[in-house]
């Protein structure tokens, strides 16, 4: 009898960042590019003068080797989280050289001045205080998939819009407690630094972000509603970092629930109720052809 095929191994997904002054980001980029290609990684790493940020995936052994390389390269305070994906979550591997590892667009000093970190239990305690202003720093399409109970949604389309939102909506709240959160914690390093720079006193953020919270907090004790949007093929994850139920609209990028996929304006790869009126018939025809080629195996 033929030997049974071994079960496919899940991909290990590593989300990581650290703010750290880098003397030669271009040299680090070259090393990471060569290492990732040898290890057959997929995903994106961003390198800048201020540090490193990214999400990558590969075999457990490959991710362990990448992690060891980063530690040996001086990233000794790396914010690092692993989860699993049943299918390849990214199409290719990229290492980008940028001005910022997460783009706020205004100068802040997250290596010198950030808010108070809270672990998940302390975060739950803070959320129970009705006087606390809880702010979701993510983009609107991320918030749509899920958020913390009682959180304010700034309804921004880019993190670059956050400073202007603060000036417009938090002016006069400098004496209040402000608690902020994001997917993995990196945006809150900059958002809390921004608020402290503007004179706010009591500024807090969730250490490790939503992903760490969902990993550590049982659903029965959770103040999280919905799923968490992630920037890979899983689209969303839930408690225990299990893959979620959402599917991305490849026209507009919104995460869609089963109910939204049952809407008459949903067509896989072409449109959903959020973008149906935003594209022309010519564009929809092009999307339809792209989807046909994808299903035929001509696109990946």
From Swiss-Prot:
* Keyword Hydrolase set for record: no
The catalytic activity, as recorded, is: uridine(34) in tRNA + AH2 + O2 = 5-hydroxyuridine(34) in tRNA + A + H2O
What residue stretches are annotated with the Rhodanese domain? 128-222
- Active-site residues annotated for this sequence: 182 (cysteine persulfide intermediate)
> SMART domains per the record?
RHOD
What CDD domains does the database record attribute to this sequence? RHOD_YceA (cd01518)
Source organism per UniProt: Deinococcus radiodurans (strain ATCC 13939 / DSM 20539 / JCM 16871 / CCUG 27074 / LMG 4051 / NBRC 15346 / NCIMB 9279 / VKM B-1422 / R1)
- What is this protein called in UniProt? tRNA uridine(34) hydroxylase
Q: What class of enzyme is it?
A: oxidoreductase
One GO MF term on file is: oxidoreductase activity, acting on paired donors, with incorporation or reduction of molecular oxygen
């Amino acid at each position: 009898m033929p030997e049974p095929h071994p079960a496919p191994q899940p991909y290990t997904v590593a989300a990581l960042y650290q703010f750290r002054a880098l003397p030669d980001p271009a040299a680090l980029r070259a090393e990471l590019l060569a290492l990732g290609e040898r290890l057959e990684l997929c995903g994106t790493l961003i390198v800048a003068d201020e540090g490193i940020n990214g999400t990558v995936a590969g075999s457990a052994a490959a991710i362990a080797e990448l992690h060891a390389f980063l530690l040996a390269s001086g990233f000794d305070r790396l914010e690092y989280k692993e989860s699993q994906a049943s299918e390849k979550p990214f199409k290719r591997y990229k290492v980008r050289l940028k001005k910022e590892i997460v783009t706020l667009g205004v100068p802040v000093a997250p290596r010198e001045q950030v808010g108070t970190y809270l672990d998940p239990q302390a975060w739950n305690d803070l959320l129970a205080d009705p006087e606390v202003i809880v702010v979701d720093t993510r983009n609107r399409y991320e918030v749509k998939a899920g958020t913390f109970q009682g959180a304010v949604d700034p309804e921004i389309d880019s993190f670059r819009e956050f400073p202007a939102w603060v000036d417009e909506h938090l002016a006069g709240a400098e004496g209040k407690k402000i608690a902020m959160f994001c997917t993995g914690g990196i945006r809150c390093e900059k958002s809390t630094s921004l608020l402290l720079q503007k004179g706010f006193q009591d500024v807090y953020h969730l250490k490790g972000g939503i992903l760490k919270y969902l990993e550590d907090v049982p659903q029965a004790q959770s103040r999280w509603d919905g799923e968490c949007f992630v920037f890979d093929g899983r689209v969303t994850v839930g408690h225990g970092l299990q893959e979620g139920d959402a599917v991305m609209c490849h026209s507009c990028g919104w995460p869609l629930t089963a109910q939204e996929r049952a809407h008459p304006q949903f067509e896989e790869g072409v449109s959903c109720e959020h973008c149906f009126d935003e594209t022309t018939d010519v564009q929809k025809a092009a999307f339809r052809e792209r989807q046909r080629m994808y299903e035929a195996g001509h696109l990946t």
